[in-house]
């Protein structure tokens, strides 16, 4: 499976790789506020959706046969109290593969891509109890599943040398297609949980501006479209790196502007929180809250009329688990509600604790946070934290060696 990489895609993918993967942990680590999902292996999980009965669906990859083994698709359904409802490990895929991009269909069937990161992406269908519901939908090896909703799949690929997006139903029937990666004639992503596609990203290949638009149902027509003016002097390229639906029907988005004439390295990235209404009109922006504390945005999350922003310090030790991380809370109307400082103690994770002390002189070991996702649950907000220990030989630019990995869920204090 090959996709033509462009300047726009590189920029927006790099932004997510660097920023979505940092940020945050949570409150006290007593038993009722923390649950360990995996220890030791380099497993990972992503939050996909909440089922109608309050259970949550997680998908990802599980490593088999130690650190040198392959990943296999891993699906976990957790009850509202975070006990396991059911779990599936699919060993039928050849080579390393993962599960991802899931949706609950109108008849209650759960559709999941169980071939992610391979050249044979397959949609499998399950009942709410994890049993097979119907035959698989095998996709073209030249496509990538970008999004899954109850009524369609959004796929991207290269056709005649051009990047394009196609929407299909769960029988494999094409609904419509257009040029561009998710965003028509641009590069971007889709807002999760929208029946009518709302897509956002960048026009990096043309004027470099950030854009968000809503498509009309299953037709390739725009209901509305908003192109953002550059907010800073000397901005070269702008992108909406993430957008989520808010409780008032609008959207909260992370805008990144890259200014290539500032900063020690010749450029500077500036992050801005933007709130759109349901018609795509800008209601407010906020960059000062992050600028004053030398922070970038790591992820945006909407929950019960509030917007939570996972913040990343611009300092070099932003990954270090020993330093507190920050979540800033805003109301949908733009009022800053306060901050939550989060810290997870590596000494309280038994599998990680044994790796904290270096075995050889001249090496250092650092407990680190790799990724955090906020998940809405019946008893509040929880964080799914991926963390571990890295060993470095102490030389400048030396390679780090992975030593331990934990997947933990932790309760988050709200503001």
What are these regions (language model features)?
Residues 72-76, 121-124, 163-166, 209-213, ...:
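A short loop-to-beta-strand structural motif that recurs across blades of beta-propeller domains
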Residues 32-44, 74, 83-92, 132-138, ...:
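Aromatic (tryptophan-biased) beta-strands that constitute blades/sheets of beta-rich domains
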Residues 372-415:
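Blade-level signature of beta-propeller repeat domains, shared across WD40, Kelch, NHL, RCC1
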Residues 53-54, 107-108, 150-151, 194-197, ...:
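Short coil/turn segments that connect the beta-strands within blades of beta-propeller domains
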Residues 42-49, 95-104, 138-148, 181-192, ...:
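Repeated scaffold domains used in trafficking and secretory/extracellular systems
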Residues 66-71, 116-120, 158-162, 204-209, ...:
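Short, solvent-exposed loop/turn segments at conserved positions within beta-propeller repeat blades
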Residues 30-62:
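An edge-strand/N-cap motif at the start of beta-rich repeat modules
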Residues 58-62, 112-116, 155-158, 199-204, ...:
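Recurrent small/Gly-Pro-centered beta-turn motifs in extracellular repeat architectures
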């Amino acid at each position: 499976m090959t996709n033509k990489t462009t300047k726009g895609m590189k920029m927006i993918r790099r932004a997510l790789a660097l920023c979505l993967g940092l940020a945050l942990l949570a409150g006290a680590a007593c038993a009722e506020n923390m649950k360990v999902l995996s220890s030791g292996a380099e497993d990972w999980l992503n939050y996909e959706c909440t089922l109608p009965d309050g259970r949550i669906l997680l998908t990802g990859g599980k490593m088999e046969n130690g650190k040198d083994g392959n990943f296999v698709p891993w699906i976990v359904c957790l009850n509202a109290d975070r006990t396991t409802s059911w779990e599936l490990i699919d060993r039928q895929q050849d080579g390393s593969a993962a599960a991802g991009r899931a949706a609950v269909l109108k008849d209650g069937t759960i559709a999941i891509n169980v071939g992610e990161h391979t050249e044979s992406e397959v949609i499998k269908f399950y009942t709410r109890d994890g049993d097979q519901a119907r035959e698989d939908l095998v996709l073209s090896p030249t496509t990538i599943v970008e999004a899954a909703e109850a009524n369609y799949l959004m796929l991207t690929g290269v056709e005649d040398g051009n990047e394009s997006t196609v929407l299909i139903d769960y029988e494999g029937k094409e609904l419509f297609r257009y040029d561009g990666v998710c965003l028509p004639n641009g590069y971007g992503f889709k807002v999760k949980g929208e029946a009518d596609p709302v897509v956002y990203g960048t026009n990096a290949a043309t004027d470099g501006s950030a854009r968000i638009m809503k498509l009309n149902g299953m037709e390739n027509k725009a209901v509305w479209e908003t192109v953002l003016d550059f907010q800073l002097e000397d901005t070269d390229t702008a992108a909406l790196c993430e957008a989520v639906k808010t409780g008032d029907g609008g959207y909260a988005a992370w805008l990144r502007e890259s200014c290539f004439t500032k900063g020690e390295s010749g450029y500077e990235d500036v992050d801005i929180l933007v709130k759109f209404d349901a018609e795509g009109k800008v209601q407010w922006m906020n960059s000062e809250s992050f600028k004053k504390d030398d922070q970038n945005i790591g992820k945006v999350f909407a929950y019960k009329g509030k917007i939570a922003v996972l913040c990343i310090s611009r300092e070099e030790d932003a990954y270090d688990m020993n330093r507190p991380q920050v979540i800033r809370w805003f109301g949908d109307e733009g009022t800053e509600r306060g901050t939550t400082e989060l810290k997870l103690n590596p000494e309280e994770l038994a599998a990680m604790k044994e790796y904290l002390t270096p075995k050889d002189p001249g090496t250092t070991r650092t407990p680190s946070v790799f990724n955090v996702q906020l998940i809405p649950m019946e008893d509040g907000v929880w964080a799914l934290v991926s963390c571990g220990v890295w060993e470095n030989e102490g030389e400048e630019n030396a390679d780090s060696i992975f030593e331990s990995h934990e997947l933990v869920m932790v309760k988050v204090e709200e503001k």
